[in-house]
Amino acid sequence: MDTNTDIKFRAYKDDKQKQYDTLNQDGGFYVESSQARGELIRMRKTDEFLNRINLVLVVRDMDNSIGLGSGKLIAARTDTAKGGTRIPRKINPSTGMPYECKQVNFDSAISYETMDAWAHHDDFNDCFEREMQKHANLDLIRVGFFGKETADDSDEALNPNGEDVTEGWIQALRDHREASILSPESEEIRIGEDGHYATVNEAVSAVKAKIAPRHRDVNDLIVLLGSDLVAHDAASFYQKRVDPKQPVHQIEMRQIKESYGAMPAFMPSCFPARGIMVTSFDNLSIYFLARAFRRSFGRRNDRLNRLESFESMSLCYIIEQLDKAAAIDFDAVKLNKSGVWK
């Protein structure tokens, strides 16, 4: 690590020590519950998808979900003159999805060479924070869609998308509302000419039909599509206007020009390449245990010429209204490529 880098890194640690009001500069420490909301703000700033969904702080590690919204009819009439009684109807689901926040580690290492490159920038502190947060955010999203189980020791080689880190949103549907999963009648779901669904749009409509009827015509529904399906359909994206003079620090969630199943379509980062999910952004949540954010400022490892950070949080992926979400069994999807199903 260059001398200039070392000076800037020490200043960074001094700054963070004051921010978190901790005496620990080298080891890990728990973030005070009063500052936990700031951790969520950092997540939202660096990824558009995370800025659209619910990031919720909870004080209990196990409970039932909050159940934001229900879609139930509350408009009614009651003849009170004849003795009728107006009875308010609950706007949240009668039974929420159970949750259990489980520890997930986000340990990382950055080479001294990379840090030396950042040290030439005036915004070294921001650059360092963004890079660390970006990688954590992408994994947070990836596990949300791919996660199937919680292993005592996850295996990246066998589960490169974090399938064994913790259960994600699609697994929540498998576990708590299996009827919301569009599964193959045999071993495959074929999309394309002579397949089960001739077009991607037909497949999306079939997934949409899996959600409760009262939700299907609400205009907040969206469809999330994987990159293979977008490419198969030769779909194009809206191009956002970007000021070339302003740096872009938030990972964009790309919106597709075409609508599918009469819904706007998006392709978030790390979504399964052949995945389809119909829901609303505010129906997807990640619950974080407020007292369980553990951070570190980075520990020097001169033996390996790198800076190591050991961080963790306790979290759970939640679908607020299970009957307002549906997804395809993306592992079973095959596409017609020149007459061959692959």
Predicted regions and their residues:
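Alpha-helical scaffold segments that mediate packing/assembly in large oligomeric complexes
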Residues: 112-203
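Sequence/fold signature of self-assembling virion shell proteins
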Residues: 2-47, 164-186, 228-342
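Assembly/oligomerization interface modules of large self-assembling protein complexes
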Residues: 29-109, 162-168
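Long, well-ordered mid-to-C-terminal structural blocks that present hydrophobic/aromatic surfaces
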Residues: 194-256
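Short, structured patches in soluble enzyme cores that scaffold and shape functional sites
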Residues: 110-112, 227
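Extracellular structured ligand-interaction cores
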Residues: 96, 105, 129, 218-220
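Short glycine-rich, low-complexity/disordered patches
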Residues: 23-37, 142-154, 216-224
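A general secondary-structure signal for short beta-strands and their flanking turns/coil
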Residues: 101-103, 218, 304-306
